[in-house]
Amino acid sequence: MTEYEKMLSGEIYNAVDPSLLKDLYACSELCWEYNQIRPTDFKARNEKLKQILGEADDDTFINPPFHCDYGKHIKVGRRFFANFNFVVLDEAPVTIGDDVFIGPNVGIYTACHSTDPKERNTREEWAKPV
């Protein structure tokens, strides 16, 4: 089983596995691009969100800055709105329904790690869906 498969299945996985880091960095680039789009260019913003998110509609709206780890594990329903500084650590699936409005400075975190420093330094994590 790959580290990616372990991550999605809720098993302990190596968070610094090169294949995972490649996907993380690719999503970071997409988020950076999204956050640089002019505030009134709604079409470009929506197109970029559709590249980032696993599922999004034409009426999906997120005020930048927006950050997520993988993006492809995030599914949002119709008429979704998130205000400034929305952060999603989507190591596991994140499913958000229709007509959801999220306030500023909200984070959704699926990733977990040990609180013991020695265990945490192994870079092992697990993730649970939200």
Model-derived regions, located:
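Terminal amphipathic alpha-helical/low-complexity segments used for targeting or macromolecular assembly
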Residues: 1-59
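Flexible, glycine/small-residue-enriched loop-and-beta-strand segment within the central core
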Residues: 66-76, 81-130
